[in-house]
């Protein structure tokens, strides 16, 4: 990327007079995007887990850097990605340590019963929809409910802003298990919550509670086009700076 930057500077020196100011700004934006892509790819390649979709990770990283730099999430190294483009029978919950560049936990996770069967295909922010909601969430406080230890979530976008009012939380459920898949052909479904397997879930909640970032991904065109977090342009220096500040 150093060579790219030098090439860009040389082009401005040698032929910049041929470009308008607007064209030079646009060209600079492309360089910034390329820088971020390269940095995101380097982390992704270090993680080296084919279950993790690159686009899901890259989009989640964009939101992480923007929100952490603005002080809107805790500046620790955890980013949780739920990839709703994958089968519910496959691992699609990924707890990533960006500092160590590795996945420290992955598992199956349920989606809302009205979002689809084995695959989630429909999403909603409406109260009573019993569908999953895509987008960025900030984890909040824990409580003990009918499912045991549970973690409240606050939606940060138009696509999930009703999360708290809808009681969308992370909790464990007996229908989230390989036994259920074997007996029913697919994973069980929730009322909209990202439900986890019972084994080890309390440790996961303990790691990500109180202000870390969770991103629920699905390649839905309207969301990817209109989300301010998914479309934010990042500087490589911003990414590196935020990660250096993590615990």
Model-derived regions: residue spans:
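Bacterial Sec-dependent N-terminal signal peptides
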Residues: 1-26
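Cell wall/extracellular polymer interaction/catalysis modules
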Residues: 23-191, 198-212, 221-247
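Active-site proximal loops enriched in glycine and acidic residues that flank catalytic Cys/His/Asp
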Residues: 218
């Amino acid at each position: 990327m150093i060579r790219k930057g030098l090439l860009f500077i040389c082009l401005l020196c040698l032929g910049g007079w041929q470009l308008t100011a607007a064209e030079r700004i646009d060209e600079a934006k492309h360089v910034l995007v390329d820088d971020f892509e390269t940095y995101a790819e380097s982390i992704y390649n270090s993680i080296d887990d084919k279950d993790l979709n690159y686009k899901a990770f890259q989009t989640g990283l964009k939101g992480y850097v923007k929100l952490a730099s603005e002080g809107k999430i805790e500046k620790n190294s955890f980013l949780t990605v739920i990839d709703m483009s994958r089968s519910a029978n496959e691992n699609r919950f990924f707890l990533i340590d960006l500092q160590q560049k590795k996945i420290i936990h992955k598992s199956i996770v349920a989606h809302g019963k009205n979002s689809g069967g084995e695959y989630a295909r429909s999403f909603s922010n409406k109260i009573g929809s019993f569908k999953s909601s895509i987008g960025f969430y900030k984890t909040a406080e824990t409580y003990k409910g009918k499912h045991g230890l549970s973690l409240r979530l606050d939606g940060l976008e138009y696509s999930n802003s009703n999360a708290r009012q809808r009681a969308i939380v992370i909790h464990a459920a007996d229908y989230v298990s390989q036994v259920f898949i074997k007996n029913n052909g697919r994973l069980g479904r929730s009322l909209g919550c990202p439900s986890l397997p019972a084994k080890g879930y309390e440790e996961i909640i303990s790691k990500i509670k109180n202000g870390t970032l969770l991103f629920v991904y699905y390649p839905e065109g309207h969301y990817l086009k209109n989300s301010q977090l998914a479309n934010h342009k990042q500087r490589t220096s911003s990414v590196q700076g935020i990660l250096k500040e993590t615990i």
